[in-house]
Amino acid sequence: MTAFDLHAPFVPKGDQPQAIEKLTTHLQSGHSRQTLLGATGTGKTFTMAKVIEEIGKPTLILAHNKTLAAQLCNEIRSFFPNNAVEYFISYYDYYQPEAYIPVTDTFIEKTASINEEIDMLRHSATRSLFERQDVIVVASISCIYGLGIPAEYLKASIPLKVGAEVDQRQLLRNLAAVQYTRNDVDLGRGRFRVKGDVLEIGPAYEDRIIRVEFFGDEIDAIRYVDPVTGETLQSLEGLNVYPARHFVTPTERLEMAVEAIDAERTAQVEHLEGAGKLLEAQRLNQRTRYDLEMLREVGYCNGVENYSRHLAGRQAGEPPECLVDYFPKDWLLIVDESHVTVPQIRGMYNGDQARKKVLIDHGFRLPSAADNRPLKSEEFWQKVGQCVFVSATPGLWEIELSENRVVEQVIRPTGVVDPEIFVRPTTGQVDDLLAEIQERVGRQERTLITTLTKRMAEDLTEYFEERGVRVRYLHSEINAIQRIEILRDLREGVFDVLIGVNLLREGLDLPEVSLVAILDADKEGFLRAERSLIQTIGRAARHVRGQAILYADNLTDSMEKAISETERRRKIQLAYNKKHGITPQPVKKGSDNAILAFLEVSRRLNTQELEDAYEQADDLPLESVPELITQLEAQMKEAAKNLEFEEAAKYRDRIKNLRSKLLGQQSP
């Protein structure tokens, strides 16, 4: 038995038992790379969970976007309710990196909005990795970016133990040194307050409050308490308080870093002047001197991450520490949808370096700023011991690395067969598709439509709306959380048809979808390649009446291969169903997502969105007004807390107007 305790209302069926056994055997034999070739709807996540339980190692599950990571984390948490299942994605709600455009001589300052709740989940992940063995972290590609030095982070943690003698003043100084701020009025995450002999800390990694009670200089009690009621949730003998930020720099290291930065500044200014770049040299000298002064005085400056090589004591070109460095020596990596995720790992470094080079060449940053970067692909894979690639369409790179350790999982436990595929001419395709949609609406089933261009998707959405179809258009400007909400609304029947371009392929778990329509299926290219077609067709593979219609005037090689592979899988499933007397059963899966619910509670509209919503309040449905009032109240309280009383008064007046509107419309 391992530390992982899997709970599931079903047992492995179909191809799952042999896939679990083979993957487990490969891993226990010490093989470093293997692939699970699992068709859509065959229960790949359950197979992953069983392998994790059997192997018993801390595991990182890597997904290629936040939406898929949230979906995976929710499923894995349901399988392992008693283990630490963590969620690690980028904590930016909005991020615009600094950049310089030489052609127009335009410098763009870095602007970012950090989601505090996601930051808390990131801290929770690293805390679990320090304290437990039964840890599963579901992460997006952001896990290959720098995260501070694990040893320094752990060394900076503050141990507290009942009965220990502690200098209270020194303890408060220690908390301030690891980025906690004192606030005796409003205790929140990353803050602490003192009331008599009681110290309360809002840890960076959870929403419970740590209460430390003293008797003189002796710690008398340590408790977790509810942040609202103050009720005791748990009494403890001891704990570690981890820093409020992952980047922790000891004083002596900071002093050494300042010297190194200053030396690099001198050398680079001389280099630029020697090359005749006097403006660039002056710019770099001025900017870096200001940053150095800030670092000496307060230990921080804007854009401090650009000095991370010096602050961490790394050599030039040395890879930064990231999430994988927080894992113990023996851990397991599972790469979900590997045919997309693996190329992402390769692409992150090159894009980052192209932007940094321009900044360095024009005197905005020192050359060492190039080392504030994500891992290179080869650096990442050097840190990985054992790995399982998971995909319905794995890439050649994964298959070659796995040698003969490619495990197929094609048979679905539910007996659901791969979609029937129909190829129809493009003439009259929209009206033909409308008839298909109406048929499915009558059966309360959903439809996905994929187009080649954004313009066509918009026009198609408008056309269907005019004909009474409840339709939405999923486009690239929709953020991760809104995307999850749209997919949930599709599942719950708020609308019936979802149209997109390259947004409807990997990992979408939509059992209600019975039809996938692919327009311009014969236009060869990335969006209509064999792998893309198989993935898109697979979105209907969870429904007992799943069908895919490919609108095309020619049969391309990619279409032939995709149709052939889907037909091969259909035959395998049909033969299995016949042999075992299985009648296909619809997939029953709730649409709730605990991660989504958490993020929805935490999400606040930004100021511009609130302005727009308020201006359009007259057009809002009545049931939406209370939500807008709640958002405005949150902004009003935030403004008052920051002593911005004029801003708070503006929100108060708007809330009054909205409440009047609400009362006026509700009265008979």
UniProtKB/Swiss-Prot annotation:
PROSITE patterns: HELICASE_ATP_BIND_1 (PS51192), HELICASE_CTER (PS51194), UVR (PS50151). The beta-hairpin motif is involved in DNA binding. Belongs to the UvrB family. InterPro entries: Helicase/UvrB_N, Helicase_ATP-bd, Helicase_C-like, P-loop_NTPase, UVR_dom, UVR_dom_sf, UvrB, UvrB_inter. PANTHER family: UVRABC SYSTEM PROTEIN B (PTHR24029:SF0). It is found in: Cytoplasm. Forms a heterotetramer with UvrA during the search for lesions. Interacts with UvrC in an incision complex. One of its GO terms (molecular function) is excinuclease ABC activity. GO terms for biological process: nucleotide-excision repair; SOS response. GO terms for cellular component: cytoplasm; excinuclease repair complex. Residues 25-176 form the Helicase ATP-binding domain. Residues 429-591 form the Helicase C-terminal domain. Keywords: ATP-binding, Cytoplasm, DNA damage, DNA excision, DNA repair, Excision nuclease, Helicase, Hydrolase, Nucleotide-binding, SOS response. This is UvrABC system protein B. Residues 626-661 form the UVR domain. Its main location: cytoplasm. The keyword Transmembrane helix does not apply. ATP binds at residues 38-45. It comes from the Bacteria. Gene3D superfamilies: P-loop containing nucleotide triphosphate hydrolases (3.40.50.300), UVR domain (4.10.860.10). The UvrABC repair system catalyzes the recognition and processing of DNA lesions. A damage recognition complex composed of 2 UvrA and 2 UvrB subunits scans DNA for abnormalities. Upon binding of the UvrA(2)B(2) complex to a putative damaged site, the DNA wraps around one UvrB monomer. DNA wrap is dependent on ATP binding by UvrB and probably causes local melting of the DNA helix, facilitating insertion of UvrB beta-hairpin between the DNA strands. Then UvrB probes one DNA strand for the presence of a lesion. A motif (Beta-hairpin) lies at residues 91-114.
